[in-house]
Amino acid sequence: LSGAPLSFWAGVAGKNPMRYRGGWTGGVWMASLFSDLGNGMFDGANLMAGFEDLNLSRTLWDKQYFLWAHIDTEEERYLEFEKWWNGFFKLTGEEIHFIIDELFIGNRLEKGRVGMNGRNIDLKNVEGPVFVFASQGDNITPPQQALNWIPTVWKTVDDIRRQKRVIIYMVHESIGHLGIFVSGPVSRKEHREMISSIDQADLLAPGLYEMIIAEGSQNNVHDVRFEARDMDDIRALDDDVDDSFSFAAVAALSATNDAFYRLFVRPFIRPVINEALAQGIRQLHPLRTSKYGFSDLNPWMLPFKALAAHARSNRRAADDTNRFMALEKQVSAQIGHTLDFVKEVRDLGQELWFQSVFHNPWLHYWFKEKPSDAGSDQNTCREEWMEEIERGGFAEGVVRIMSALAHAGGSTDRSELKAFREISHKDERLVQLVSARLAEAVNKQACILAGAPERAIAALATLLPEPADRRAALAIARSIFADDDLLAPDVKERLQAIERALDISL
């Protein structure tokens, strides 16, 4: 889940104004109106306009100024990006209505109230490791919207463990929403390491982890580890302001406005809209007219085409010491700062308006949040597994040892998981646990260790009664956790406890 919101109401006051827009626009009725004006299709240019409106200085000034200030090198990149960025898509009216009403305004997904194919979607039922990638610099999907569903759905990390789920998240410090998907450095680092970690993630004990990427000792190689986290680590990213009832009031207002529109306004709009008129309305969208208005489609631009060729052939770049260039940069910076100030005032005004209208005790009384419906208890950590604490053989003993050591210090290095998977493919007694059975074995042994860690370690002597098996199991552990100087104190202590339980050391 890269830059994907699942907690649509979450955010920090004074920092994430986009979440308030559903309130001051009246809700989903505008999507219904735009879909009707599009003859049943919603124009994606409306979504892009909302995105560009978030950063006035970049949209109205900085992007264009940077192009002209670097006209000798930026032309090709600028045109390539603009062609991609302005390739607007269309959604059916039903699609956009579902997305806005059920998700962005209703926030029903994390509550388990989104119905599909006759049943509600419960995020607890997502099997396999879940990777979440968020960024502090993302003003479209802030970390709170990407991560707050975890404590909402699971309540505690123990709930995650009981249902044998692995959730891994990573928070970038600065990259923006678009950069999460198209940035080259992010693709070469975060995306590559997440993809490389998929095969090792199912060897982690069930729980919540933060993925940490550190620069490695070799070029283009990173050291990846998984730090155990608690729900408080996710809540720490938020501002502890409970404004859920305000958004519940917005959802109620949205439903009322949409019902009014569909009943009293739609019957007068749909009969007069046909495909030709809808196409004309789409072409008149400001994001389109601002592009083809300065293209060859506009006959008034023909003289500029000839002038452009003349200017290109007689181009003389000004020196950096040119006083007019220095003045130009100062004026440009001042324009950008002014637009940023206008944006801040606008966002603050919208937030204050939202809070004054929707965040008051009267609405709190009428629009109390209902408890989440999510939270089935199926696939919980099986109680009978605890009864198997002394059952098993060499394979179970090795998996228990590896799980105990890998998670002893609260941090698990990806290289350790990768090394154990490679060993499990080579050892004839472990090869039977490859793939799905290996993940199940890790879940079982992690459950046993979490429930009774001291008993689980002591029972290793029963699982490995033969001295040769004990030496072989410890040799596997030592091949992965080899350097005593680099081992965390908790890992050393756990390894010594295992050696004492087996009455053997290497």
Indicate residue ranges for each PLM-predicted region.
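Conserved alpha/beta-hydrolase "acid-adjacent" motif
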Residues: I140-Q145
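Short beta-strand/loop motif that positions the catalytic acidic residue
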Residues: V126, V132-A134, D138
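Alpha/beta-hydrolase-fold enzymes
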Residues: S2-E94, H222-A318
